[in-house]
Amino acid sequence: MKCNNCGSTMTYDVASYGLVCDHCGAKKQLHKPEEGTLVGEMDFASAMRGAGTNWGVSRRLVTCKSCGASMLFDPEQMSELCPFCGSAIVLTPEEADCGIAPNAMIPFSITKEEVTKKFYRWNKFAFWSPEKFRKGKVLGNLTPIYIPYWTFDADAVITYSGEFGYTTEIGEDTKTTWHKRSGIIEKHLDDHTVCGSRKFANDKLLNSVTSFTARDLIPYTPDALAGMPAEMYTIGLDEAWKNAQNEQMGKWITRACYGDTTADCHNNLNYSVEFHNLAYRYVLVPVWLAGCKYGGKIYNVAASGHNGTGNCHRPLSVAKLVTVIAVIMACMILGMFIPYLNLVPALAVPLAIVAFVIYLAMFMKTLSEQRAEEAAKKEPEP
């Protein structure tokens, strides 16, 4: 969007939920939907016929040559850094075919500064990481990006048959009685979520910070994307629905059968499902991404742009791990020898502490010598 004062580009401001001019600082407040307003679903069949492709604003598609991620940017942007790998990317002048347009989103509401503070607060509790990582300024530049997600709603008719077990307790024993059961269940599938990014569909780090409910969503607002990159979905609507049925629907159907039969377990369960009134939402979910540089490696960081929930990969302190193992082994060895030394059990703890201190001193001396040798090897010869 162009500024009414100077004609420069306006970008989304996380702190104010509005637009700010990059040149003159003019601001425009965006309209917030009433709290509790739910975003409706879109018809699945209509989307498969090509309807619902208007994003309300032109976007340009670019694929990072380093990591392969596909992203959508504002047309005014000429170059950017990839939010996923940090590589420099140059945008082409052609507008993109963006496919199906989103109808819901969660706008960024947590600022970069807030995420940074939260990260260093989390990091202090990373006991198993090296002290320099826990207490040092290791967090790289945080980059915002919207990640694509699909949600599905449908009316399901489940026809099932199988053997269902009912467990009863008789004293200390349990007995399971099996009965053949069959039936038809009518059930509503509500807001079943599938990640639309092939890159992150199985990424535990990202998925741990992107959970949301229907009450978190607002109708898609093009202005909230101003200056913000969005990853292009690489798992399309049809594929996402097939994945939901093939990989995730079995547990949901099994729970429905248990609820209908009140059974405790099952055997040889067979079922078929018919779905009606299938609808979807295409949701843009905000995420802050960064990397922590430590020991020549980069450890990924992800945080929710909605509630600040965060997670990251961390290095493991070998010294701490070895020390803990050594203490455990020392206590075990002392426990074995105490009967032969005619020592009272009360001496076990002091002896374990002494053994630990001796071992720690030897370990630190060895580690110091090793580091000195490595430093000497790096020094250039005269």
Which functions belong to the PLM regions below?
Residues G25-K32, G86-E94:
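Short Cys/His-rich micro-motifs in 6-15 aa windows
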Residues G56, I100-K297, V318-A319, T323, ...:
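Charged, low-complexity helical/coil segments in non-catalytic cytosolic or luminal regions
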Residues L341-A352:
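Hydrophobic alpha-helical transmembrane segments
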